[in-house]
A protein has these predicted regions:
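Class I S-adenosyl-L-methionine-dependent methyltransferase catalytic core
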Residues: 1-184
């Protein structure tokens, strides 16, 4: 796992042990940042299921102004901190050890890009989308990027959000959402 582009390009990131974290593949990561390439510079980035921190680190490396990386596990937060130090991006990031719903319940920040890649077997994705819409932390032109397995549907409508395009990369789907009333 490595940083693909930007100031930390080529830096190998530490990966988590065990099966609790499933890092986004380089192929999918590159595709995500190709899709949102014109939105990254100067953005405020939230990774709600941080894992290794690689998606926020990629955003920071490509010019995001700041990032918040949330993960409920102490080991994951330590690993994210290590990866931020490796890439020399610690000063632009905040690592929060918290359950995603607890974090959202107290969040007062607004983000331009929100990345959601929760454990595939859970309903975390749907719950996170609903909560994000309720608390209004997405900027007016912001984008929510959802990663999910090909076999998991995401057919629900979320009040306050407009669903954009779906992109398939092998066994992975990327789905975009924006605030209702904005162009997707």
């Amino acid at each position: 796992m490595r940083v693909i582009s930007g100031s930390a390009k080529g830096t190998k990131l530490k990966t988590p042990d065990g099966l609790l974290t499933r890092p986004t593949s380089d192929r999918v990561k590159e595709a995500v940042f190709s899709i949102v390439q014109f939105e990254v510079q100067g953005s405020r980035f939230l990774d709600l299921f941080g894992g290794s921190g690689q998606m926020a680190i990629e955003a920071l490396s490509r010019g995001a102004a700041s990032a918040v990386i949330v993960d409920g596990r102490r080991e994951a937060c330590k690993l994210i901190g290590d990866n931020l130090r490796l890439t020399r991006l610690s000063d632009k990031a905040k690592v929060v050890q918290s359950d995603y719903l607890s974090y959202l319940g107290h969040c007062r920040e607004v983000f331009d890009l929100i990345f959601l890649d929760p454990p595939y077997a859970e309903v975390f994705l749907e719950n996170a989308l609903k909560k994000i819409s309720e608390i209004d932390i997405l900027s007016d032109r912001g984008i929510i990027i959802c990663e999910r397995p090909a076999e998991k549907s995401l057919d629900m409508a979320i009040e306050g959000l407009t669903r954009g395009k779906d992109y398939r990369y092998g066994k992975t789907w990327i789905t975009l959402f924006r605030k209702a009333g904005t162009e997707v």
